[in-house]
Amino acid sequence: MEKISLESPKTGSDLVLETLRDLGIDTIFGYPGGAVLPFYDAIYNFKGIRHILGRHEQGCLHEAEGYAKSTGKLGVAVVTSGPGATNAITGIADAMSDSVPLLVFTGQVARAGIGKDAFQEADIVGITMPITKYNYQVRETADIPRIITEAVHIATTGRPGPVVIDLPKDVSALETDFIYSPEVNLPSYQPTLEPNDMQIKKILKQLSKAKKPVLLAGGGISYAEAAAELNEFAERYQIPVVTSLLGQGTIATSHPLFLGMGGMHGSFAANIAMTEADFMISIGCRFDDRLTGNPKTFAKNAKVAHIDIDPAEIGKIISADIPVVGDAKKALQMLLAEPTVHNNTEKWIEKVTKDKNRVRSYDKKERVVQPQAVIERIGELTNGDAIVVTDVGQHQMWTAQYYPYQNERQLVTSGGLGTMGFGIPAAIGAKIANPDKEVILFVGDGGFQMTNQELAILNIYKVPIKVVMLNNHSLGMVRQWQESFYEGRTSESVFDTLPDFQLMAQAYGIKNYKFDNLETLAQDLEVITEDVPMLIEVDISRKEQVLPMVPAGKSNHEMLGVKFHA
C-alpha cells in the first residue's frame, strides 16, 4: 500500500471526521462514552458534520436507518465500547435484514487491553459477524482513511447493508504523520450490476406466452430507484403488480394495475393473483415467509423469473426458472430497451380487477373509532405525499394497507426483523434527512414505550414529526394471534394500566392531543397539518384485528377474514 505523507500530524479521530466529510457524509447519530472520547473531542470544533445526540444507542441506530431508508444515502452512527456497542446490535441486525446502508463506528478498549476482559470490552467484531455485510477492527491509525473508504463502498454498493468499524481508543487518539492510500482495492468483492442479456430475453419470451403474468415488486425497486421503470414496464405489457411490504410506493396505490400488498396481511386480489399466475416476474424481492406463506404452494402454477442483485437470494426459498443477477433498475431498463413482444392480458386484467373491486375493506358503518379510518383520513390530509414511518405490530399492517402511497422510499418500516421500538427514532432520522417533507409516524402503545426517550430530540433539534399513536391498550398483534390460535388466552399481551402519554409528551415539550370521539374525528385530525412536533393519541378498540390474515404455514389463498360486497 502506498504511504501518503501529511502536512502535519493528525489524530485517528481527526482522520475519521475528515475522511467522512470527504466522502460526502454530513450527519452522524451517536452517543458518547469512554472509548470514543477522542472522537467526541475531535468533533467538538469540527466543521462540516453535524452530530445528533440520541438518548440510547438503539435509538441512534434506528435514527441512522430512518435517515438511510428515506433517502438512499449512507446512515452513520457512533457508539462506545461494551454496552454501547451491544445496545446497537438490534439496529445493526435490522439494517442487515432490510438491506440498509449503514456505517457504524464502535469504540473499543485500547489495543493492549483487547482480549483481557478490560472495562467495557466486548468482542463486537465477533458478535456482529453474522449481522453485517462486513466488519473491521482498526489496528493502525494510518489505516483509518483506507478502511473507511472501503467500508463506505461496501455498505452502499451491490446489495446495501451495515458495515461496522471497531475503533480502539488508542488508535483514535494517537497521531500519525502519514496515511495509507484511501483507495478501494477489493478484488474479491465485485457485485454483479449488469444482468445477463440472454436471461433478459428469456423473460420477454416467457412473457409473450403468458396469459396470467404478475409483477412482484420488492424493496429492491426502491433501493435501485427503479419505480419509474417498473411502472413503464407494467403499463407497456399490462401486467398487474403486487408489492411486498418494503415494495410499497413503487407503484401508486391508485394505479389501476396495482393489486395491493401480498402475503400474510396482503389483499385478496394480490394473493389470489399470485396463486393463479402462470408467470411471475419478481424484482428485488427475497420471498420471505410473510410473503410466500407455504413455499410449496406459492405461485404453484407459475414459471418464475427472479431478478435480484444478491445471488444468494435466488433459489433460496422459491426456485427460479429464469434467474437474473443484477441491479433492478438496469434489468428493467434492459427489458424496456428490447423490442416489444406481443402479449394479451385483457381477460386477466379484467379478472384481477374484479377480484380487487369485490372485496370491501372494513365495515365503515361501525360506530367506533377505527384505525383504518384514522390512517385513511391522515392520507387525505397529507395528500398521500408524506414520508410514512411505522413501528411494528397491527398498526404497521393497517398503515401498509390503507395509506395512499405514491412514491418509492415513502414507507419507512422494519420489515425483515420486525423491530418494536423502531418507529420513533426512525421517524426522527427520516425528518432530519428530509426537513422539507412531512413525516408521519404511526405507532402502537407497546412500541412507543420501547424508545420514547428519543422524543427528547424533537425540541432540541427542531424536528417536527407527527406521532400518531393508535392505542388499543395491548400488544395488538400478539393478542390477535393468541385470540386466533391459542384459544383466546391473552397471556401478558394486555395492558391493564398505561402511563399518561399526554403528560409524557408535555414533559418533552411536545404538543399533544387525545381523540376518541367518532363524530369529530375527521375534523380533529386536521391538527396534523401544524408544523410542530406533536403526539396524537387515538383510542381504538382492543378487539380490532388486522385482516385478511393468512395463518402461518398456510397457502396465500387460505385467507381468513375476507369480506365481500353483497
Regions found by a protein language model. Name each.
Residues E2-E7, A142, N301-Q394, L518-E526, ...:
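Phosphate/pyrophosphate-binding active-site segments
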Residues Y31-G33, I52-H62, A77-G84, R139-E140, ...:
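Active-site nucleophile and cofactor-binding loops and adjacent substrate-binding regions
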Residues E2-V341, R377, L381-G384, I457, ...:
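N-terminal alpha/beta PP-like core and its mobile active-site loop of ThDP/TPP-dependent enzymes
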Residues E57, K116-D117, Q190-K202, G262-G266, ...:
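A general structural motif
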Residues E57, D166, D308, D391, ...:
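Acidic active-site catalytic centers that drive phospho-/nucleotidyl reactions
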Residues F119-Q120, I314-I317, P323-V325, K329-Q333, ...:
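Thiamine diphosphate
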Residues S13-L17, R21-D26, G34, F39-I43, ...:
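Active-site diphosphate/adenylate-binding microenvironment
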Residues A224, N271, G326-K329, V368, ...:
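Conserved structured core elements
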